[in-house]
């Protein structure tokens, strides 16, 4: 049971696994089970070290260059291309790949069959929602599907998993891939690929916006069908020259598109009917907002590539409930709704979230990572009832609000970045929510859509979202 070109059975020689988080540890386990010679490196000793060493791996501690006998480096997304270890490996001609590329090379298949196809999604925002929507649709169609990659389980675990009878455990994989993962991928050829959108993000890691965009485009290179949002100029431009482009639109779909007609999602890309085929009524979807309609259309497009009929697409999308910290209503108090979109970690995502509500008290701030917030603030100013700012880069947002929304009331909540004021994230969020309540009136939405990363005050975006929900519940 191997990948049809035999890669899954060939020894890889000595492999250095750089970074032992969830995906790195999973890669090391699979390599050890194959009998490969596995070396381990990381900045600090990981929790899984004893397990991996007991299985036969060798721990080398922190490295600035690979040992001379290394044939392959498998790196984790947190390792930048300009890190000394990876730069030295490249200079020596040692191949560097990520865990998804390793998974593609090592995927298994039943005798005489192809490995399970990948239906892959990337983009600045909406990846996780689209991939989990796609998983829901594939499961509704009776496929043995799973969401994996940058969401859920590591791909290397999924593509090598077997049922009790030894056959592959999955017959379709909904794959989320980040730009970091795609940077280290060269041969991944999904059956269908989607670039949802491309906005200014992660430029610090990639070095430039062009490099970031090109990493996203890598996903489309070997895919027979390429999907993008027609409303995103960069993403739609990437599929424009593809041999089989499909776009999704919030408007009436043309031939080759999926879109919206008379309150329903309609397929005019894969349906043989001249007018297209209705997939699902918009009112049947449990996730709201134009951005989620685009996500649903993209998931539907990839499901159609997988051969899923319209009825199953409709069932899968209607049954999808959405993920945590992604536009989730966490409570209503005195006629004010409180919505957690802590996953909106950049301006593009925050803009999509804000567009779903007519009058908003916006909770924003954190680590902007150099992103330009002026276009966002200018676009959303008319719907702002007030703004509460927190986090390290709150003053950047405050200056933008002064330029583009000078009449909107705003409150700045101090945090541990204020030299001498040391508070934990949960107490900061309680102050933030209290300030938002003072700015809101019945009918407003208090929206946590920070447009920034969370690690200045919180452990991660999930911690930020939980702190918000806890603070709302404490209002009574």
Predicted features, each with a name:
Residues 3-4, 8-14, 25-34, 279-385, ...:
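Nucleotide phosphate-binding/pyrophosphate-handling subdomain across enzymes
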Residues 1-106, 288, 475:
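N-terminal leader/targeting and accessory segments in enzymes
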Residues 31, 73, 121, 150, ...:
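Residue-level signal for inorganic ion chemistry
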Residues 42, 61-63, 97-102, 146-149, ...:
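Beta-strand->loop->alpha-helix junctions that form or flank phosphate-binding loops
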Residues 21, 44, 151, 231-232, ...:
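Residues in the short beta-alpha loop(s) of Rossmann-like NAD(P)-binding domains
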Residues 50-57, 376-444:
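C-terminal helical cap/extension that packs against the catalytic core
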Residues 32, 68, 77-230, 234-244, ...:
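Phosphate-binding loop of NTP-binding sites
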Residues 36-43, 227-230, 363-364, 383-393:
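Short internal beta-strands
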């Amino acid at each position: 049971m191997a990948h049809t070109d035999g890669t899954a059975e060939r020894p890889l020689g000595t492999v250095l696994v750089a970074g032992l988080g969830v995906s790195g540890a999973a890669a090391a386990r699979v390599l050890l089970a194959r009998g490969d010679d596995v070396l381990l490196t990381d900045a600090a000793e990981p929790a899984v070290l004893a397990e991996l060493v007991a299985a036969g791996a060798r721990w080398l501690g922190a490295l600035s260059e690979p040992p001379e006998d290394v044939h392959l480096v498998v790196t984790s997304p947190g390792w930048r291309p300009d890190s000394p270890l990876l730069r030295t490996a490249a200079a020596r001609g040692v191949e560097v790949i990520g865990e998804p590329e390793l998974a593609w090379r090592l995927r298994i298949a039943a005798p005489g069959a192809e490995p399970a196809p990948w239906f892959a999604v990337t983009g600045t925002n909406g990846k996780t929602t689209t991939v989990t929507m796609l998983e829901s649709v594939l499961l509704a169609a009776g496929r043995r599907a799973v969401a994996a990659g940058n969401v859920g389980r590591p791909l290397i675990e999924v593509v090598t998993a077997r049922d009790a009878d030894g056959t592959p455990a999955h017959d379709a994989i909904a794959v989320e891939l980040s730009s970091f993962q795609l940077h280290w991928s060269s041969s991944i050829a999904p059956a269908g690929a989607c670039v949802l959108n491309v906005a200014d993000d992660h430029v610090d890691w990639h070095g430039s916006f062009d490099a970031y965009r090109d990493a996203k485009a890598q996903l489309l290179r070997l895919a027979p069908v390429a999907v993008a949002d027609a409303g995103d100029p960069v993403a739609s431009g990437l599929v424009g020259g593809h041999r089989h482009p499909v776009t999704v639109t919030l408007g009436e779909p043309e031939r080759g598109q999926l879109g919206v007609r008379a309150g329903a999602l309609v397929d005019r890309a894969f349906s043989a009917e001249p007018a297209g085929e209705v997939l699902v009524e918009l009112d049947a979807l449990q996730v709201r907002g134009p951005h989620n309609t685009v996500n649903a259309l993209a998931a539907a497009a990839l499901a159609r590539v997988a051969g899923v009929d319209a009825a199953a697409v409709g069932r899968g999308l209607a049954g999808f409930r959405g993920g945590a910290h992604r536009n989730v209503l966490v409570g209503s108090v005195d006629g004010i709704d409180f919505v957690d979109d802590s996953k909106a970690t950049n301006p593009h995502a925050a803009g999509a979230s804000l567009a779903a509500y007519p009058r908003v008290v916006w909770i924003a701030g954190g680590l902007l990572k150099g992103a330009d917030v002026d276009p966002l603030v200018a676009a959303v100013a008319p719907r702002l009832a007030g703004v509460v700012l927190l986090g390290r880069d709150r003053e950047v947002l405050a200056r933008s609000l002064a330029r583009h929304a000078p009449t909107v009331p705003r409150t700045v909540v101090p945090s541990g970045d204020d030299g001498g004021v040391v508070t934990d994230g949960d107490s900061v969020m309680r102050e933030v929510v209290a300030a938002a309540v003072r700015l809101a009136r019945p009918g407003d939405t208090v929206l946590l859509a920070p447009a920034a990363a969370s690690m200045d005050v919180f452990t991660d975006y999930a911690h930020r979202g939980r702190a918000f929900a806890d603070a709302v519940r404490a209002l009574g």
